[in-house]
Amino acid sequence: SSGTSEQFGKFLQGANAGPDASLWPKTASGTFSSMTPVPLSNYFNFQGASGSALLAAGVKSKIGAIGYAESAWFTSNKLGTALVQNWAKEFVAPTAAATSAFLGGGTIEANGSVTTPYQKAIPGGYPIGTASYGLVYPEAAKKDAEKQKIVAAWHTYLLDKCATKFPELGYIQITGALYDKAKAQIAKIK
């Protein structure tokens, strides 16, 4: 099962909601072929791949191949990327700034997750962006306090330092309300 496939499926379904819902009626799934409206092999020479590394290698090795993965895999394999039309009617590349614009237009939920607005016109927003999340034990789980300090420090590093160390891989430093919410969530790790 793939989180990337599930997120891509959510985009395909969300972007086609409303009057065009029949274009992508199935619910998102971790397996791309199980969420497509029709069996892909009936229309295309379809070859799935498990994991972004295998997918990127497969796309690179086949003339005319297309695929979807995190932008870092396409960058590191020197593969081209497609511009995707957003609801502001712009064709946008998958850049860190465009992903940040899209996620910044989302709703920050109480648990820190972001609900993405596929049908919201966000100028400059790349509409297939997604956030990464860290799952940790809540204070109520009464885990070892010293280990929890390490977990909190790791998440602080990811939030404050990691993105600025690896911008060439497409990581972005979050800011504003989303950053504030992430810091508040990290403060709960005890």
Tell where the protein language model's regions lie, with residue ranges.
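Flexible loop/hinge segments at secondary-structure junctions
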Residues: 1-190
